Amino acid sequence: MELSGNTVLITGGATGIGYALAEAFVEAGSRVIICGRRLNRLEEAKRNHPEIDIIQADAANPSDRARLLKVIVENFPSINILVNNAGIQKDIDFAFGELNFEDIQEEIKINLEAPVILSAMFIPHLKGKKNAAIINVSSGLGFVPAARMPVYSATKAGLHAFSIALRHQLSRVGIKVFEVVPPAVDTELNPEGRAKRANFKIDLKPAEFVAGVMEELKSDVFEIGYGPSKKYIQASRAELDEYFRMMNSRW
């Protein structure tokens, strides 16, 4: 993938990995539009990087998705890269917890439904564009699920499968499909869960992770891991089962 000269839309682009990707694409010489739910964080990103365009939109909301498509097509018709990055993560205990079905549905809508539907909506506008691509941000937990985050793990496993199938289909129309597979990165994801695990320290910063991602994108590596998540991508089923036992031994 060429990193410069693109028009890139990044969902969930105001914070964390999405924001680091936005900074990296701007630095590489691409035009970047970010969308997200929180206007204050979008405006903060805009203050830091005036060249970034911002759109307040909830990727999980059908009417917001339709509006987002309309705004992009009308104002940024050169769009050639869609980054499905928006995501949420929740600790959910199906055995002993008080289940909130709205929380479960929200996690599925944002993490899996949104990237699938947005891909379908934007593909007609990516066809025929130079350097066209869809970049899906999944998770190492899509390969080795965390028992305390069953819905999150399931949505990311679904996004992994979707990325494989979509890559095969879109190879016929010149659109590349990349999957970025983060390990644990120090972001605002799941603050409630992290508060319960104060002794679990995450050292990897979004900018460091994304620097590695950009190098892999440049080399057309279609499944991009980092540290433990790179091992998960390359592991056999027996190895994945062992990683699962190790990760969840105290659950």
Task: Enumerate the predicted regions with their spans.
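Active-site helix of classical SDR
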Residues: 119, 155
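Conserved glycine-rich cofactor-binding loop
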Residues: 7, 12-16
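Residue(s) in the substrate-gating loop at a strand-loop-helix junction
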Residues: 139
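C-terminal helical subdomain
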Residues: 179, 195-232
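Conserved mid-core segment of classical short-chain dehydrogenase/reductases
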Residues: 89-105, 148
